[in-house]
Amino acid sequence: MLLSVPLLLGLLGLAAAEPAVYFKEQFLDGDGWTSRWIESKHKSDFGKFVLSSGKFYGDEEKDKGLQTSQDARFYALSASFEPFSNKGQTLVVQFTVKHEQNIDCGGGYVKLFPNSLDQTDMHGDSEYNIMFGPDICGPGTKKVHVIFNYKGKNVLINKDIRCKDDEFTHLYTLIVRPDNTYEVKIDNSQVESGSLEDDWDFLPPKKIKDPDASKPEDWDERAKIDDPTDSKPEDWDKPEHIPDPDAKKPEDWDEEMDGEWEPPVIQNPEYKGEWKPRQIDNPDYKGTWIHPEIDNPEYSPDPSIYAYDNFGVLGLDLWQVKSGTIFDNFLITNDEAYAEEFGNETWGVTKAAEKQMKDKQDEEQRLKEEEEDKKRKEEEEAEDKEDDEDKDEDEEDEEDKEEDEEEDVPGQAKDEL
């Protein structure tokens, strides 16, 4: 069967529009993940990941992911995929993070490595291409890292992107485009965007201060000056403190014993402080001198800042003080729309049910604590009542004893007689 040229071109166009999915991991095959993910042996005490949907979830099976399981540990785990380059195409990196342990200090980011990485020796100093994701440590650090390795140097973003710091699952997306622009999304909503060249210090500045320029000696930057016609009044200078005119030497003051009497000092009501001439507009004021700039001879544009020759490994290389973070729904693709749709079909489908389950657990815990508190108070009241009854019985016994002793006294006296 022969196809018409328009139809053939249409089919080719549809094929070209298909998204390229370089890596996708949802952990839907139970323990099958252990054959795809490799633990680093660089250190013997790396923390262990386990497959779990956590203490609360929207869908117990779909929400299963890699969970950190040991406190105060470094973690190093990675998965490889068919190597690719993002030259000439968009790169989208996406995954979900859930800090259900109410994390105090720890990473929730991923690293993209070239396929030359020795996965069994991956560690914190292993060279990567891109690092992306949330990082939390105390109240001061709650940011989304976006770090690019450019010519062997890790370059951090110049902006502060705040991450989510609650206990729920959140979707993190990094988009890097071939026009050297980028976008960061959290929960499929844009939180930052811009130019790679503007928001990272990849290149020397386009402009520099002219080294041959200097501020003229007669350049006056003072907006105000002292009024040369103003002078200090003759009666201005008064002491700040004066002897108290109302003070009197005590009658029992002995100058031989106490020394010469001096009245206490008080604030002088006529004291005016330091005199300063009034200010007037400076007739010679020229404004703040601005150093002129010239084109930087060291600057050279790089249209390929965004591009990497080789991506081949996604790794979790991080430190956590309190474990419990769950990573899931990893995706690396070249299609922004596909990534957004994938996020909606994973995180988007289960987020509401996850919150409902957490709210229900919190309510059950609240009621349990109220019941325990009520029971504790009742037990304390019962103990107090029992103590009061015992005290009353002791007092009655003491009174009976005293009465018995009083009755015995006359008989005792009679016997003595």
Curated annotation (Swiss-Prot):
> Where does the record place the modification N6-acetyllysine?
K48, K159, K209
List positions binding Ca(2+).
Answer: Q26, K62, K64, D328
**What keywords are annotated for this sequence in UniProt?**
Acetylation, Calcium, Chaperone, Cytoplasm, Cytoplasmic vesicle, Disulfide bond, Endoplasmic reticulum, Extracellular matrix, Hydroxylation, Lectin, Lysosome, Metal-binding, Repeat, Sarcoplasmic reticulum, Secreted, Signal, Zinc
Region ranges (P-domain) = 198-308
Amino acids binding an alpha-D-glucoside: Y109, K111, Y128, D135, D317
N6-(2-hydroxyisobutyryl)lysine PTM positions: K64
Where does this protein come from, organism-wise? Macaca fascicularis
Q: Where is the composition biased (Basic and acidic residues)?
A: 207-251, 352-379
The UniProt annotation puts the region (4 X approximate repeats) at: 191-255
Which Cys pairs does UniProt list as disulfide-bonded?
Answer: C105-C137
Q: Which stretch is the leader sequence?
A: 1-17
Instruction: Specify whether Disulfide bond is a keyword of the entry.
Output: yes
Tell me the protein family, please.
Belongs to the calreticulin family.
Put simply, this protein is called Calreticulin
Region labeled C-domain — which residues? Answer: 309-417
Question: For this UniProt entry, what is the primary localization, expressed as one broad class?
Answer: endoplasmic reticulum
Stretches of Acidic residues bias are at 252-261, 380-409
Where, by residue number, is the motif Prevents secretion from ER? 414-417
What ranges does the record give for the region Interaction with PPIB, renumbered to this chain?
237-270
List the PANTHER family.
Answer: CALRETICULIN, CALRETICULIN AND CALNEXIN
Q: What Gene Ontology molecular function terms does this protein carry?
A: calcium ion binding; carbohydrate binding; unfolded protein binding
Q: What is one process in the GO biological process aspect for this record?
A: protein folding
Its domain description in UniProt is: Can be divided into a N-terminal globular domain, a proline-rich P-domain forming an elongated arm-like structure and a C-terminal acidic domain. The P-domain binds one molecule of calcium with high affinity, whereas the acidic C-domain binds multiple calcium ions with low affinity. The interaction with glycans occurs through a binding site in the globular lectin domain.
Q: Where in the cell is it found?
A: Endoplasmic reticulum lumen; Cytoplasm, Cytosol; Secreted, Extracellular space, Extracellular matrix; Cell surface
Annotated region (N-domain) at 18-197
**Which Gene Ontology terms of cellular component type are present?**
cell surface; cortical granule; cytolytic granule; cytosol; endoplasmic reticulum membrane; extracellular region; sarcoplasmic reticulum lumen
sequence repeat boundaries on the chain: 191-202, 210-221, 227-238, 244-255, 259-269, 273-283, 287-297
